[in-house]
Amino acid sequence: MQREGFSENTVKAFLSDLRILTQYVGAGTAVRNISTNDLNHFVDWLANERGIPCNPKSLARRITTLKVFFGWLVESSVLLKDAAEPVVHKPVMTPLPTILSDTEFDAVLQVAQTLRRAEKPDARPYLLLTLLLHTGIKKSECMNIVLNHIDTSNPEQPFLWIRYSNPRRRHKERKLRLPVWWPETLAEYREQHQIHDTLFPCTARNLEYVLRNVADLTDLSKGLSFELLRWTCVVRDHRDGMPDDRLRQKLGISKITWREVRLKILRLTSPVL
C-alpha cells in the first residue's frame, strides 16, 4: 500500500482492521484456516456483538479490507481460494452528487462565452469551465497546474499533465486530453491576465467566485462548484461510452474508490421510472 501511494491514515485503518480480525480468530490461527463462514461470523460480530459501536460506513470499510487482503493473498499465491469473495458487501452510499443537465451545460458555457466576448473580455470563466468539464480534475489539482504541465506541441491533440510533488501521490499522476480549440482560449487568458507560470495565480476561493458569478448570470439555482463540474464530466464521459477503467484512470482514483463512484454513475444515468 505504501508503494502505491496510499495515505498514512488509510494504511493505519487497514492494519487496525486486520488486528481486529486477528483478535477475533485468535493470533495462532493460520490464515489458510480462516473460512468464509468465519468471516461472515466476524462481520456479524462487528455489527452486533462486539460491544463497540460500528457504524455502517466503518463496517463497509472493514469488509473492503477483508476483500482486499484475501484477494491479495490469492494473487500472491499464498492462498488458493479467496475466503472473502463470497462475503456480502453492501457499500454505504453517500447522497448522489449534483450534475448539470444538458440544457444547463449549454447555458453556462454560453454565459462564459458572452463574458469572453464582452466589451471588456475575460476568457478566464470559459477557460476554467471547459477545463473542468473536459478533464474532471479536482480543485486541488486545478490549483497546482503550471504552464509547463500543458502540452500544446501537437496542435491536433493538446494534453494536460496532472503532477504531484508528494511521492505518495505519484500514482495519481496522469495525462489528460484537452479539446483542440482550448489552447486558443488559453492564449487569450494568458494575454489578458499576464500569466507566466501558475495557470491560476489566485486562491481557490477566487475561482469559486468566478464559478458563482457564472451560475448567477445563468440563473442556476444549484450553483456551480468544482465537485459538480467533476461529476458532470464523469457522467457525460460514461454516457459517451468511455470504458470503466479508462474513466477510473482519468479521475485518478483507486479501484476500491471506483466501486462506489461507479454505482453513483449508474444511478445518475439510469432512466427515471
Question: Could you describe each region identified by the protein language model?
Answer:
Residues N144-W182:
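Conserved tyrosine-mediated DNA breakage-rejoining catalytic core shared by Y-recombinases
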Residues A107-K139:
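Basic, Lys/Arg- and aromatic-enriched nucleic-acid-binding interface segment
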